[in-house]
A protein has these predicted regions:
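Amphipathic alpha-helical interaction surfaces in cytosolic regulatory modules
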Residues: 17-93
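A glycine-rich helix N-cap at a beta->alpha junction
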Residues: 86-106
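Helix-loop-beta hinge of the Bergerat
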Residues: 106-136, 189, 196-212, 231
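Flexible ATP-lid and adjacent glycine-rich G1/G2 motifs of the Bergerat
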Residues: 193-250
Length: 262
């Protein structure tokens, strides 16, 4: 991970070194906490030094929430600006699109909660059909698509999220693809506690949701989808992160890490 901190000067905020790791998510949570009660303000945010392109998804969700009551201006260092123009994120903030000739971006998208078919087509065409992914059978690809679609459906089924945000990036030097799916709903903790009549903390709720057979939908099998996804990622030396409320979960090389955001 990198060093993440905010430079505060009035309503102008600079965010440095945002990786897609615990520290990076903590920095975005801190940004949200700073402004969540702001109303009718002009807020300028500067992205500096480094910004993982797939973090456009959580940042986009935060900026949309802040933008309902404030005027948001987003700026970025030139190297960051270029990639975020290529993936389409900055098109939502007044910047022209830039052609991605290297085909390393997976477009930033904002799906309405009823756009299941469009989301499935996007994941299939933009993510699962990428040549950098490992070879797998059509049936395996279909199962992975179903698992990712289930994440979308669960977010819209359980929460009042208005949009689902997605974005990804291929890194040729590391030979890896980072992909993020974000919603702005009530979170896993509230969903699980409502289902069980419990008072679990966010990390405990995430743990519960990861167990085979556990589901928050009546009469619907659950848990299996995330298990299948984790097995696929482990086999291909990938990792899975889940961030919900103040809980953080990461499974990398079958090593499971739980942490709590401040």
């Amino acid at each position: 991970g990198g060093i993440c901190y905010l430079n505060l000067q009035g309503m102008n905020k600079t965010i440095y070194y945002i990786n897609d790791d615990f520290e990076g998510f903590q920095a975005l949570i801190s940004l949200w906490d700073l402004f969540r009660s702001s109303q009718y303000s002009d807020i300028e945010i500067q992205l500096s030094r480094f910004f993982s392109a797939n973090m456009s998804a959580p940042l986009g969700a935060i900026l949309d929430l802040l933008g309902t009551k404030n005027n948001i201006s987003l700026k970025a260092d030139s190297n960051i600006q270029t990639i975020l123009q290529k993936n389409g994120f900055l098109s939502y903030h007044g910047y022209p699109a830039v052609r991605d000739n290297n085909n390393t971006t997976i477009q930033y998208m904002r799906f309405k909660r009823n756009e299941n078919a469009a989301f499935a087509e996007y994941v299939s065409n933009k993510l699962l059909n990428r040549p950098e992914l490992p070879d797998f059978t059509p049936s395996a690809k279909k199962k992975i698509l179903q698992v990712i679609l289930e994440i979308f459906v669960n977010a819209t089924y359980h929460t009042k999220t208005e949009y689902i945000y997605t974005c990804g990036q291929f890194y040729p030097n590391k030979q890896c693809i980072d992909f993020s799916i974000v919603d702005t709903g009530t979170g896993i903790r509230n969903t699980v506690n409502n289902r069980l009549g419990a008072k679990k903390h966010a990390v405990e709720a995430i743990e519960w949701a990861l167990i085979d057979g556990n589901t928050t939908k009546e009469g619907v099998p659950g848990g299996y989808g995330l298990t299948l996804l984790q097995e696929f990622l482990h086999y291909n030396k990938g990792s899975l992160q889940i961030i919900s409320n103040d809980g953080y979960y990461c499974n990398e090389n079958k090593y499971k890490k739980f942490r709590v955001f401040s």
